[in-house]
UniProtKB/Swiss-Prot annotation:
<dbReference type="InterPro" id="IPR037528">
    <property type="entry name" value="ArgB"/>
</dbReference>
<keyword id="KW-0028">Amino-acid biosynthesis</keyword>
<dbReference type="GO" id="GO:0005737">
    <property type="term" value="C:cytoplasm"/>
</dbReference>
<dbReference type="Pfam" id="PF00696">
    <property type="entry name" value="AA_kinase"/>
</dbReference>
<comment type="similarity">
    <text>Belongs to the acetylglutamate kinase family. ArgB subfamily.</text>
</comment>
<keyword id="KW-0067">ATP-binding</keyword>
<dbReference type="InterPro" id="IPR036393">
    <property type="entry name" value="AceGlu_kinase-like_sf"/>
</dbReference>
<feature type="binding site">
    <location>
        <begin position="63"/>
        <end position="64"/>
    </location>
    <ligand>
        <name>substrate</name>
    </ligand>
</feature>
<keyword id="KW-0808">Transferase</keyword>
<dbReference type="InterPro" id="IPR004662">
    <property type="entry name" value="AcgluKinase_fam"/>
</dbReference>
<comment type="pathway">
    <text>Amino-acid biosynthesis; L-arginine biosynthesis; N(2)-acetyl-L-ornithine from L-glutamate: step 2/4.</text>
</comment>
<dbReference type="InterPro" id="IPR041727">
    <property type="entry name" value="NAGK-C"/>
</dbReference>
<keyword id="KW-0547">Nucleotide-binding</keyword>
<comment type="function">
    <text>Catalyzes the ATP-dependent phosphorylation of N-acetyl-L-glutamate.</text>
</comment>
<feature type="site" description="Transition state stabilizer">
    <location>
        <position position="241"/>
    </location>
</feature>
<feature type="binding site">
    <location>
        <position position="178"/>
    </location>
    <ligand>
        <name>substrate</name>
    </ligand>
</feature>
<dbReference type="GO" id="GO:0042450">
    <property type="term" value="P:arginine biosynthetic process via ornithine"/>
</dbReference>
Length: 283
């Protein structure tokens, strides 16, 4: 890349930086990006850059691969049904240990090393994420969000800290739940009136043709997104991600994005370039 191209990229980013300065962007961090050191470090730098130029990033994370690793170390077989982890009490204890004690702190340390200031919390802190059992309870301690209490986030964001939130909620009686991080991110984005919700995934975004990378839907709206589900253009694991975006938009989030976290700096490419890199859904 020559000097002229570098200047052009910075110039293209400027109006987006100005537009999103002071705005909250909720980012769900997960998938294979969490297992690749280069991708992890690029993500940490991206979050630091967003914060440095005045954007207010809030990171929600899961930790599936790391949870599975620890279950196997403890000679417990991970069990799934319809894509959801079967979570008994023993598994829940490990989920809490891994998400809050390992994954969360790794993200915090990674971002802090860049010179930015991240603070790690879980949905248990300040009753941030209230939850209940999902469905009929057949998945055990898998939960769904009933209420977000975002007050704990306000002083952190206002002082320039970057909240890093593990996707664990609890009932008012103190029963912890393992919750899908996509849906936690969507509900938090709605509760804090975020400008954007961004889901980092292992896919490009919404494809009109499943196996055709050239069929990426760069921009769509709520109605079309619902149609994609009804017409089975969106299938399998993309259904809950798209539904999560739809729900967030219906609650006032201005734009939701599904992007490929396997591409270095995909977060910046989506936010600060004209063409973006994934799928943007707007109301």
């Amino acid at each position: 890349m020559n000097d002229s191209q570098r200047v052009s990229i910075l110039s293209e980013a400027l109006p987006y930086i100005q537009s999103f300065s002071g705005r909250k962007i909720v980012i769900k961090y997960g998938g294979s990006v969490m297992e690749n050191d280069n991708l992890k470090n690029a993500f940490f730098r991206d979050i630091a850059l967003l914060s440095t130029v005045g954007v207010c990033p809030i990171v929600i994370h899961g930790g599936g691969p790391e949870i599975n690793n620890w279950l196997r170390k403890l000679e417990i077989s991970p069990k799934f049904e319809n894509g959801l982890r079967i979570t008994d009490q023993k598994t829940m204890e490990i989920v809490e240990m891994v998400l809050m004690g390992r994954v969360n702190k790794e993200i915090v340390k990674g971002i802090n090393k860049t010179g930015s200031l991240a603070v790690g919390i879980s949905g248990l802190d300040g009753n941030l994420i209230q939850s209940r059992e999902l469905g009929d309870g057949s998945h055990g301690l898998v939960g769904e969000v009933t209420k977000i209490n975002p007050e704990i986030l306000d002083p952190l964001i206002s002082k320039g800290y970057i909240p890093i939130i593990s996707s664990i909620g609890s009932t008012l009686e103190g029963i912890s739940h393992n919750i899908n991080a996509d849906f936690v991110a969507g509900e938090i984005a709605a509760a804090i009136n975020a400008e954007k919700l961004i889901l980092l995934t292992d896919t490009q975004g919404i494809l009109k043709e499943k196996d055709d990378k050239n069929s990426l839907v760069a921009k769509t709206n709520l109605k079309e997104a619902r149609d994609f589900i009804d017409k089975k253009i969106v299938t399998a694991g993309m259904i809950p991600k798209t539904e999560c975006c739809i729900r967030a938009l219906a609650q006032g989030v201005k734009a939701a994005h599904i992007i490929d976290g396997q591409i270095e700096h995909s977060l910046l490419l989506e936010i600060f370039t004209n063409s973006g890199i994934g799928t943007m859904i707007v109301a």
